[in-house]
């Protein structure tokens, strides 16, 4: 489906480092329990529940029970969510979900049904079911979310630092050099960046590299070339961080997208 990625996985000892997604995340837990940090909270999701993550929201992930967890996940594009919100709720602007975990067995079954329709090659059913579950979740747990646009002086420095790292991703400056370029101190920049984006600059940069590598893989670039293009030293370096954030190695991710 255009604008949508799907992942069906079981993890036992897997631990996702703090990362973000450009898309939304609907993760229907079918077995076990997933635990994850969302903001300052540690939350848990089990069978019949859905983990909901808004775009650009730092979060982690690990097993909440010794048996690990199994889930079926949908990653819908923000534009798709906005269009459905506009059609069903007349919501405009920054739309998102207000809770990281919701207890809704019917919606969880709809997420599974989206996967099964896609696996069967039934694009019409998959798209219809996706819109149905999205509208349901938006009606019960959606709303306008606060804009992340920084306003304070420190936050403006953080935004400028982020823009520099985005532009010079393959050859970024040190924290000291970056702070000097922005006319602030390294410690002040570190504190402002963490406050604005939920993680320090070096963690954000790794996450941003993975996100850009994912787009390059979607465009057909081989993993080794994608690794160099985003500033990783080599493909194993990309493999390690990509798997920590996405859950599968870049080669497996790309093969799954080509099916």
Task: Kindly label every feature range from the protein language model.
Residues 78, 130, 158:
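Short amphipathic alpha-helical/adjacent loop interface patches that line ligand
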């Amino acid at each position: 489906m255009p604008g949508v990625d799907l992942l069906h996985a079981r993890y036992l000892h897997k631990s996702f480092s703090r990362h973000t997604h450009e898309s939304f995340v609907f993760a229907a837990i079918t077995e076990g329990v997933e635990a994850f940090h969302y903001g300052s909270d540690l939350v848990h999701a089990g069978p019949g529940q859905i983990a909901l993550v808004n775009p650009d929201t730092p979060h982690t992930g690990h097993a909440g029970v010794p048996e690990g967890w199994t889930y079926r996940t949908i990653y819908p594009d923000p534009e798709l969510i906005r269009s459905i919100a506009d059609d069903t709720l007349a919501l405009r602007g920054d739309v998102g979900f207000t809770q990281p975990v919701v207890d809704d067995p019917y919606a969880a079954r709809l997420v599974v049904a989206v996967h099964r329709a896609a696996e069967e090659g039934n694009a019409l059913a998959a798209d219809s079911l996706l819109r149905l579950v999205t509208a349901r979740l938006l009606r019960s747990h959606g709303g306008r979310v606060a804009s992340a646009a920084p306003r304070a002086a420190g936050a403006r420095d953080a935004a400028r630092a982020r823009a520099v790292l985005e532009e010079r991703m393959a050859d970024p400056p040190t924290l000291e050099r970056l702070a000097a370029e922005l006319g602030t101190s390294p410690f002040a920049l570190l504190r402002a960046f963490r406050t604005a984006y939920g993680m320090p600059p070096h963690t954000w940069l790794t996450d941003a590299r993975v996100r850009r590598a994912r787009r390059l893989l979607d465009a057909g670039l081989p993993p080794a070339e994608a690794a160099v293009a985003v500033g990783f030293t080599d493909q194993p370096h990309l493999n390690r961080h990509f798997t920590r954030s996405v859950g599968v190695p870049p080669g497996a991710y790309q093969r799954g997208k080509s099916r």
